[in-house]
Amino acid sequence: MNTEKIGNVVMNYDYYIGQDLYSDGDIEDILLDIVKNHDKSEFPNIIVESKSWPILYHLSEVRTNILNWYPFESDAHVLEVGAGCGAITGAIADKAEKVVAIDLSKRRSMINAYRNRDKENIEIIVGNFNDVAAGLTEKFDYVTLIGVLEYGELYIPGNDSYRTFLKKIAGLLKPNGKVLIAIENQLGLKYFAGCREDHVGKYFEGIEGYTTTNSVKTFSKKVLKEIIEGSGYENIQFAYPYPDYKLPTTIYTDDFLPVKGELVNNLRNFDADRMVFFDETKVWDTMIEAGLFHEFSNSFFVEATKPGEDAKRSEQTGQMTSFAKCSVERKDEYKIITRIFEEDGKKFVEKRAVNEKACGHVNRMAELAKTNPYLTENVCLVPCEAVADGVVQFPYIEGQRLDKAIDEAVKQGRLEDAWTEIRRLKDIIMNVSGKEKFQVTDEFRTVFGQIPQPEPAEGEKQAEPVDPLAVLEGYEAVKNVNMDMVAANIIFADKTYILDYEWNFDFAIPLKYILFRSILFNGTLNVMPEEQRKTLMELIEISDEEWQLFLQMETSWQQFVTGTSLTDLYPDMPSKYTIVKEENYCNNPPEPKCSIPYRAARKVKRMIVAALQKDK
């Protein structure tokens, strides 16, 4: 057996032909140097400094979000096909007993090994998938195809490549084993909105049916399901990574779909320039209202089961995840995953630390729940139980969410009802017990006080430094107050429940700032016409000056928690976007000679209409 060890990782060269048939070029040498000579904790700073899409793509922890929420059994054996540079390998190894990773490239496999060299449960086999599959004797609980199925014609040439490929995968699974697939949606909304097709870099190539492309292909939901069913799998479950599967932050399912105003993070074209034909957030809202999100989701995550009678039992068997939010764009001590799942007919919410450093942050929620601090008899925190170190669990509460009550009232023009609900929100926040007069402390300033001094006007001298937080002295404040007391986290059932209380500090926070956050994070209230907005501000008794100060405090806090996020990185990346203005694609352009943006936009309009008609 031709093997070597890199750290604890076993490299298997039995199927390696002596040369790499696939390479991304010089960037692989750069990546190998980084993972050899730098700890993973240094990767975020390297990404920020590089301003490079390949480095971001291969080293960002956000990549792991496609699987770090998935409830692998702790004794599972997982085969990862097309492991590449190992962006996801380590996340699987953290959950499963054993990972066997296959990749065609020795160089990419070495990057994988060096970045995961501390893990003792990874074997990397370098070689062609068909050769490796023919030689494998072990059967696996899971096989992952993350960004792999679309290359099925390269793995298995022929007229029915994708079904043949999936049938070969089934041969590597135990009875009742599962294949996990992540793939772009051929009809993803981003392609209509002006993004290039991910694999070939051409506008409209996928949604026009890959008329000029062979060797790589993505599929609509309907076609993908037919391919998987036709390969002999059953119990096919779809999930919808947002914004896409490559850098996802949220996983939706048919049991838990996004609501209007939620899908706002759409400029993610780090890898290539794009056009912007329309406001994707507004179109997403239309799709959500029409019940079409699942058809136009930018990516799919699919779980499909190989039939069999020998399903093994474990601590996770029977759980069905309906939603996951992966909060890894944070400092290590705050990284968590929130998951909604069903087990034995009951729904639960789980919050789990991503690493040991974040365990204390999660455990604090269970400690806080025991005391139900500063709330009244009829307003309480949803119960919380610590089920393991760094893992807490809540019952899933059904009832009327306050944010939906507000949104529906505004949408239906029932403004007096909306104001009534906002008064109720204000009362819940402002009438907690344990109030004290606010004083600025060093702890408070560390989190909320990193506010830059205003720049002097041209020709003027820099004014004496002022403390922008000083105006808050004497405000009503509370220690350990729940920072997440926004309308979306307040639900009316047998009592008024606060659903989320991840964020609280042991120093006093002004209650007006909590009220500000409840308005800031409600999309409906933020887009009100000016006159209604004025009434709203009078109702919550927050002045324009206070609003601006609270915005700066919010920015300071987010920076304290996250450092530099992907959204922060976007302006510094080489890829750009071009907004196609309305006058360029109106129905009756003034000039008979159409511009390229106009022609493109007309094409998009026709495609969307055709797709919607086909869906019907």
At which residue positions do the language-model features occur?
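N-terminal auxiliary segments of SAM/dcSAM-dependent transferases
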Residues: M1-H38
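Conserved SAM-binding loop of SAM-dependent methyltransferases across substrates and taxa
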Residues: C85-A96
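A short glycine-rich, Lys/Arg-flanked "PGG" loop and its adjoining helix->strand segment in the class I
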Residues: D160-K178
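Conserved class I S-adenosyl-L-methionine
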Residues: L180-Y203
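Catalytic activation segment of kinase domains across protein kinase-like and atypical kinase folds
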Residues: G209-Y210, P468-M528
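ATP-binding glycine-rich loop module of kinase domains
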Residues: K325-K370
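Conserved structural core of kinase catalytic domains
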Residues: L381-P456, E460
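C-lobe/activation-segment region of protein kinase-like
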Residues: L499-C586
